[in-house]
């Protein structure tokens, strides 16, 4: 499939992901490198791949006679410590949180559990964090660390340059899904499915500190072909479940040969993939924003898609964007 033949859409800017400098460990007025997005009620949760904090942003409210405006967010610490300020040193030390998903509550009454996952692209990027939400969808303060080593190890036999960039739960809550992002050295992106009940049991044990239990093995691995932009393969950056086994994806065409180094983003796309792994709808995004997080809501028989971007430069703020996709019904 050549995405040059697909629709072109211009995203609408919702706003930049701004924070108070006094709250940011580096004194920045924004969150950069946004890489995962989850909506819970009227809150947006955002992970960034070069931070130790989670960004929390409230849905813009409509003021009479004025357009909606995204207000400054707050930061919630995921991991202790401080990352180096130097770009090279920071890249080497960061846990690389590339994925964020919402899981069902593990027992206590709550709006669910957020799960941030490291990419697995380096040994120090194999940590996950579980964050419990209260019944209102706010972070409750309870969290647990997850060692992803045994979850990722079998995947390296198929993907030597593993790079987990997306994660979601199927609508019927039977499957836990990871998305591997390819690169120009190995352009294969993949949808990796697990039995949710097995993963759920493993995560509960991890949360209880039982680190000796090995993670479940994937039940299927689908190679996903997304096409090319100017000769550069599009690769998955995130996904979210839709009805009927379908799922929506975000993707970028980045000129890099591996999972660690950044490259020029020559194109970006969003679309819908069916249960068989076939792309049944896709559109390229005008302006080539490097979209790395996606959330979807059904509105007026259409899909309202919210995206966050990674500018690959800490001096620039990540952006929240919106587009609308047609419903498949």
PLM region spans:
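Sequence/structural signature of beta-propeller domains
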Residues: 1-329
């Amino acid at each position: 499939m050549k995405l040059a033949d697909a629709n072109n859409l211009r995203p609408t800017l919702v706003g930049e992901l701004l924070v108070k400098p006094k709250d940011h460990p580096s004194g920045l007025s924004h969150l950069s490198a946004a890489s995962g997005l989850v909506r819970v009620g009227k809150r947006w949760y955002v992970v960034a791949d070069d931070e130790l904090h989670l960004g929390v942003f409230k849905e813009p409210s409509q003021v009479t006679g004025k357009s909606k405006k995204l207000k400054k967010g707050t930061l919630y610490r995921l991991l202790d410590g401080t990352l180096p300020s130097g770009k090279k040193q920071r890249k080497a030390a960061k846990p690389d949180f590339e994925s964020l998903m919402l899981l069902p509550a593990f027992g206590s009454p709550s709006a669910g559990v957020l799960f941030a996952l490291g990419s697995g692209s380096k040994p120090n990027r194999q940590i996950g964090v579980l964050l419990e939400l209260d019944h209102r969808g706010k972070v409750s303060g309870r969290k647990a660390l997850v060692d992803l080593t045994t979850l990722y190890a079998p995947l390296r036999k198929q993907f030597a340059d593993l790079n987990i960039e997306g994660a979601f739960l199927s609508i019927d809550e039977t499957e836990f899904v990871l998305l591997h992002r390819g690169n120009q050295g190995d352009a294969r992106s993949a949808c990796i499915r697990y039995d949710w009940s097995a993963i759920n049991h493993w995560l509960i044990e991890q949360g209880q500190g039982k680190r000796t239990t090995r993670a479940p093995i994937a039940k299927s691995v689908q190679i996903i072909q997304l096409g090319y932009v100017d000769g550069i393969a599009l690769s998955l950056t995130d996904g979210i479940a839709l009805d009927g086994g379908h799922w929506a994806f975000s993707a970028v065409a980045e000129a890099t040969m591996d999972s660690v180094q950044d490259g020029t983003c020559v194109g970006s796309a969003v679309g819908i993939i069916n249960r068989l792994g076939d792309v049944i709808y896709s559109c390229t995004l005008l302006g080539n924003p490097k979209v790395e997080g996606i959330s979807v809501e059904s509105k007026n028989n259409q899909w309202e898609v919210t995206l966050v971007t990674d500018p690959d430069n800490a001096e620039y703020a990540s952006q929240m964007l919106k587009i609308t996709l047609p419903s498949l019904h």
